[in-house]
Amino acid sequence: MSENSTPERVVLLDEQHQPTGTALKSEVHTEATPLHLAFSCHVLNPDGRVLVTRRALSKRTWPGVWSNSFCGHPGPHESFEDAIARRARQELGLEIRNLTVVVPEFQYRATDATGVVENEFCPVFVAVTDTDPQPAESEVAEYAWTAPRDLIAAVESAPYAFSPWLGDQVREPALREALG
C-alpha cells in the first residue's frame, strides 16, 4: 500500500521501455511477471559508508537476504525523484539528498526460490543522508553501514546471501565509481 492507503500500481513496459499500462503491484509479481518500471537506490552517509539492508523475513520475494539500501516502483505519473524520496521515508525513515542516477539503463530478471519472478527496468541511483535509518519492520530486518569495497567483496565471495539485483549492480563500473 502507498502512503495514502490506496493500492500501489506499477508501470508496465514494452521491450523498448515504453509504458504500456499499469497493474496492481500485489498482482504483478508472479511466475510470469511482466517487465515493469522500478528503481534501486544506494545511500551513503557523510563518512562514505553505504547502507545495506536485510530484507524482512515476511517479504514475498527474497526474504532475509541482504540488498542495497532500498528499492521501489514509481507510480503512474510519479517522477523517480518523488518515488525515491517517498520510499526512503516509508521504508527507512530517511531524508535523502544529492540523488544521482548512476546506471540509467539497468535491467534484470531473476526468479526466487518460490518461483516468483522479478522482471524490472530499474535505473540505479545513489543518494546521501545525514541520519541513521528508522526501518519499517515490514520491509527491513536489519541494516548496516559498510565500506563500499567491503560490500563488493562480500557480494563477490558469497553471492547467495545477497539479492540478485545487488549482485548484478555491484558489477557495474559506474556504480563502483559512484560508491567510491
UniProtKB/Swiss-Prot annotation:
Pfam families, per database record: NUDIX
Cofactor(s) recorded in Swiss-Prot or TrEMBL: Mg(2+); Mn(2+)
Record's cofactor remark: Binds 1 Mg(2+) ion per subunit. The magnesium ion binds only when substrate is bound.
Reaction catalysis annotation: isopentenyl diphosphate = dimethylallyl diphosphate
Keywords annotated in UniProt: Cytoplasm, Isomerase, Isoprene biosynthesis, Magnesium, Manganese, Metal-binding
Residue ranges of the TM segments: none
Cross-referenced InterPro entries: Idi_bact, IsopentenylPP_isomerase_typ1, NUDIX_hydrolase-like_dom_sf, NUDIX_hydrolase_dom
Residues that, per the record, bind Mn(2+): H29, H36, H73, E118, E120
Molecular function (Gene Ontology), one example: isopentenyl-diphosphate delta-isomerase activity
Tagged with keyword Cytoplasm: yes
Residues binding Mg(2+): E91
Cited function: Catalyzes the 1,3-allylic rearrangement of the homoallylic substrate isopentenyl (IPP) to its highly electrophilic allylic isomer, dimethylallyl diphosphate (DMAPP).
Stated name of the protein: Isopentenyl-diphosphate Delta-isomerase
